[in-house]
Amino acid sequence: MTNLICTKYTSILHLLEDLVHHDTSTTTDLIICSTREEFLDEVVTQLDHHHHNSSTSVGRQDEEDAPDLVPAMTTPSSSHALLSPTLFLLSASQRCRLAFCPSITTLRGYLSSYPPGHFITPELKVHCNGHHIMIVNLLRQHHGTTEFTLQGLSHTFASAVSAAHRTRRSLRLVELRGDIASDNHHSDPDQGSGLWQAQVPLLSTSIKIRDDGASWGRRTVSVEKVASRWFRLESG
């Protein structure tokens, strides 16, 4: 099984869209490093952003084509695919199972006992081919804490890899941006895939954390280099 760092996704909507249209023979356990409420709030915020951008685009085009009809126009076409109550979407949702781990301790505990009892099916007991684990925003959860170090990240990475190996599943780590207002998805080093380039100290003990999540006066190493012991960067 493969352990990959996936950098192709920029937002939670981008990720969910891809999972919906994924191969129907695969099942994904999506481990979200936040509370359920925070996750839903982020999804709703991004849907609103998508709707606003789509409505603005449609409105401008309609105004150019038929300015007298603009007040009477509605914008059903701006609705996102994830909001469409189709049988295809319902079927796709059965292939994706969500788990929420709002703290580092919760995440490590969940991974140490993975898979939970209600995830175990007769099919899983026979084989685990076509099953994936995807952990979303692991780095964001660690960033700004005393666990954002080689020692702390190695502990969590090892727990994730152990869970995947134990269940013979492929593993992907995904970092998404929370703020999608900017078109430049790589402009903020403290969000999304930029966190893989962050420098972290070696040990979790006796470090001082600034407001921006950085530390003072310690030997450092890049997060990507720490992860390279277990993971490789997904191509494409």
Model-assigned labels for residue ranges:
Residues 1-236:
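N-terminal regions of ATP-driven nucleic-acid and macromolecular assemblies
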